[in-house]
Structures are given as C-alpha cells and as structure tokens.
C-alpha cells in the first residue's frame, strides 16, 4: 500500500515536471520565433563548447538583486561581439563575450548595460550563473551570450558595458564597447513597408474656384493601406493648422478635396496620411473674389459713411474736451476768486499781525528757479497771509540802506527765516566754506564798486552764513529752532540742504505744505491777535488760488527743465562767451579826438533819482570820434552792476541801450500748453510795499514763467548817477558841435 502511494506520487511529480519543461520550451521557441537572426549576424563555434560544459544563466531584475560589493578583483571580459536581430519589425542585438582568466573563479554573474545618447532609455540585464555556479580556468574560452536587447532603432549608435560581479571595482572601471544597429533593409528586407514610411504623392495641385480651393493629389499604393488622408491648411501668418479629412476615391487614381469659403491670402497646405508619416507641403495664394457689385460704387458706399462718422466723432470729442476744460478752469477760477476775495477780506478786516518771513535762496540756479522763488514768495504772502521779505522786491530799499544793512535788518526783523535749498545753493555755500572766505570781516563790510556783480549775486552766500551763525547760537542757548526752516521742492533732494543748515527743520514742498503752514501760524507772537488760517491747505488744492496756480506751473517748468537737462547746473556754472570786440577805425581827417571816458561813481548823498545817462554826439561827416575805455580805471566793476553803482550801456553805433520793458504774461489760458503758462500779476503784496516799492512791484508782477526768461531786474541796482568826463584835445571845435549830456529823471 505504501509502495503504491510512493509510485503515485512519483508519477504525479513526473507529469508536473514534463508540463513545466514543455511550457518553458514553448516560451523559448516563441522568443526564438519573435527574434530571428538575419544574414550578417555573428556566430561562433564556442557555443557548442559552452553547451557541452553546461553554462547557463538565470536572468533577474537589475534593480533588485544587485550587490556591488566584493572582496576580489575581477578583470574585464574579452572578445566582445554582437549579433543583430529583428524583433517585432524593430532592431535587436545579442551581446557575446568571454570571461577573463584573472579572477574567473570569483565570478558569480554578469551585468550587461546597453544605452544610447538618451540616458532614460538605458537597458540592463542581470545574468546569474545557474550551472555551474562557479567558473574555473577551463571556461576562459567559452563564449557567453545575453538575451536579445529589443526595441532598438535602425542605424543608431549604442554603448555596451559588461560588468562581472561581485567585485570591489566600480562600473566605470570596465571599459565600454560601441555598436551600430543595421539598417531596416538589411534586417527586414528592401520590400518591407516598414522601411518605406515616407511615401509622398507625386502630384499635389491647388486651384481656386470662386471662394473654394480644390486640392488634387494621387493615391498611395494599396500596400500602404491608407484609408483616409488628412489635409492641413492655414494662412501663413496664422498659428495652428485647420484640418480637412479626405476619403480616397475608389474609382480613380486621384482624389479631389474641396476647401470651402477660404479668405484671401497665402495658404500653407500640407497632405498627411492617417499615421502622420506621409507628408507633402505646398503654398497657394488665394486672390480676392470680384463680385459684380465691386468697384467705385462699393468703395464710395463704404468710404462716405465712414468719413462722416469719423468727422462727427472728432467734432464730438473736441467739443467734449473743450467743455471739460472750460468746466475745470471755471471751477478753478471760481475757487481762485473765492480764495482771493477771502484773503482780501481777511487782510482788510485784520491786516495785522502777519508773520514776517525772510527768504534766502540761490540766485545762480537759472531763471526758472528764480521764477519758482518769486511764485513761492507771492504764494506765502497772498495765500498764507505772511509778510515776505525778498531782495527781488526791495531793490530801492537795498540801494538806500546798502546790502549788508538791509540783510541784517531783515533777518533780525523776521519771525521766520526760510532757506530754499537747491543744488546750486549747496554747491556755492559749501564751496565758499571750503575756501574759508566767509569770514566775519567779509560779512560785515559794505560791498564796494569793485565787487559789483559777484557780491550782488553772492548775497545769498553771505545770508546763508549769517543764518548758520544765528542757528548755532540759538541751538546752543535753547532747543527751539522753530524760527529757522530749510525747504526744498520736488526737483531737489534733502541732500541739497547744506551742512551748516542741517540743524533747521526740513520741509519738502509741496508734500509737507500743511506742516509748513501750521509752523508759520502756530508760533506765539508778541502781538495781540492773529490772522485766521485759510481752510483746507494741502498739496491737492493749493493751486486753486492764482498764486498757488502760478507756483504750480513754475515748479512744473523747473522740474521739466531738470528732467530734460540733468547737467543744468554745470551749464549755469559755465562762463558766458566773450563778445566779439569791434573797433571803430579812426579817421585821419577828424577834428575831434575823445581820448578817454572815465566813469565816476557818486556817493550816496549825490544820488538823485536818475534813471539813465545818455551821451549824445553830433553826427557830422567831417568829424570822427574815437572812443577808448581804460580798463584799469573801470576795474571789474565796470562790467557788472552793484548796489551802489549803475552803468550805461553804450552800443557800437554810439546809442545808449533803452531799459528793457517788463513783460506781462497770461494766466492759464486753456489753449496754451502747461509748459508755456506764466505767473499772473502779483497784486497781493503787503501794504507796506505799496508806497515805496511800486517799481519793484511792477518787476515782480511781470516776471514770466515757463519758457520765457524773466526781465533783467539787475538793472534796478542803482541809486547814484554816473558822471562821464571827456577830455577834449582839439581847439577847433565849434560850440554848437560839442557834447550834450542829458540825464533823464
């Protein structure tokens, strides 16, 4: 009984073994049928020896059973060769090699790598010795083979690396081998359709019929099995293609595909098959279809309504913009008149007290900066209710008292001292400070005639030095520096504040206008009552008044000037070009020779209200006049003006230059660009200037902004007339032909 059971178990095991062997052999036969050798593959007689010795491998996954560490050194393999196959209409390769006798007894298996230029398509085979489990020296001539590497491209280069294991050597120690797969014709045959995927039609004709395109092409051979053709078309400047599917006509060798309602233009047309392998492309220009109604009548019917509509639209736009501008400016004018009337009423009801303000500024930053200063002073006086002291408005007072006396008195009387800091002010103040010329002796002395233009233009440097000294004194005694203020406009920077004035509070205008206004009206004055504050003082509404609007335009013009000319200060510092000197030739037959003319500056007591001096010469054809000016007698002051001197302008034709007439300018005309706007008449000066500063008022009120240059106010720096003496060295001059000096008062 027990024997029969053992016999049954033996038969069952035998059946299972036979079934497993049959299935394995069937799988191997299937792989053999799937990947077949072609002509040109490499063979070797060593395969028979390998089968006799019974060398078989167990194939495993590379990523699972990989232990790279070993204790012995195994040398690289020898005699690497390749066999080319075809698997599923693709190229395949089998790798062959021989083990090296050095370290062959330690080999447990091999790893075979195959990769192309793309590292992501790397293939690997892990071969473990199955029978025998260990090699010896007699296996050195046995050729070993890998499984086929399939899914390879035709005529492509690959790299193969064979690494025996286990070993302590890295994979890079074993040198690679290179191979190139065979072509499709060699592996599959020249008649195989896989080797000819790029069939192109011999004919691709395009014609236009109305607004349709007719595309005609021939069919591919029936062996390709194309069931449908794809026609892609698009305008050349468009992005993606549009698709038209065309079924081949069974009755003929050609097929016509119609593209309906195409717009005029140049089209790119491409024919493809259903596998997207067959392509042929062409271009065709679709012309405009002319209808019977096309022509001049159609053009006029389209153009005339468009022109009429455009004209109405333009007229409507212009009228709307004009109306909008009128509303804006009328609103501004109403607010301006209300503000002016309110300020006038406040001044009439409570004319005193008004904070006295002294403004120190740089007179060397150009005419546009001077326009900003005058507008700012007028704004403080008109809108902010302050009494402003500005040298441009008090030329007569300066002539009477002298520059230093007037400067000291105005600084002492002022409740607030405002320094308008700019790029030029910092440059000249710190330049004078570095040179050490701003000494107390130079500050306290009266300017002489030889200082003329430089001392007059550098008055702000002396004023800055005095303000700096007073600021230091107040800072040492107490911390209340509210009397001193350093302001700068948006075309300047905080770094433009000189170091000597850094202790004073700083304000950026017009961003910090409310803080400045509060500072001007918050100081507790020694007077009984104070003037009410104008409401709603801010950066957004200060230009509602005339003075604020003038200040806004002046700041805008200066800001535009700084933006367009970043090196504007360097241009202002450049010396003016020398005028061309023209000498009057001396006539030999003249009876009168005027050798020299000396200009004598009178004292303050000898200063009648003289406006100009005129030198009149008789115009006789027989008498010639030679005029020579002594540069040593005139000195540097003869070419400029001073607080106590004036100079007549004598032209080469012998006539005196008339005084430059002040120019008046408009206020915010809606038809004038913003860059050409000007300051309005500054008629809101304080009452103390009405009786003795009428001339200064006219000068300040006629100062233009924008692109206009202000009038030369330096011509008013005069309180003393000039006495001209002529030495006559000829005795035959008739009394009626003498020199006539006329002084106009």
Swiss-Prot record:
Chief site of localization: membrane
InterPro entries, per the entry: IL-17_rcpt-like, IL17R_D_N, SEFIR_dom
Domain SEFIR: 354-518
Location(s) in or outside the cell: Membrane
Record key words, sorted: Glycoprotein, Membrane, Receptor, Signal, Transmembrane, Transmembrane helix
Gene3D superfamilies given in the database record: 3.40.50.11530
Transmembrane segments: 299-319
Residues making up the signal peptide according to the UniProt record: 1-26
Chain intervals for the UniProt region annotation (Disordered): 432-454, 631-713
Topology versus the membrane: Single-pass type I membrane protein
Pfam families: IL17R_D_N, SEFIR
Keyword Disulfide bond tagged: no
Listed Low complexity bias regions: 693-705
Listed GO MF terms: interleukin-17 receptor activity
Alphabetized PROSITE patterns for the sequence: SEFIR
Disulphide bridges: none
Positions in the Extracellular compartment: 27-298
Subunit structure: Interacts with fgfr1 and fgfr2.
Protein's UniProt name: Interleukin-17 receptor D
Source organism of the structure: Danio rerio (Zebrafish)
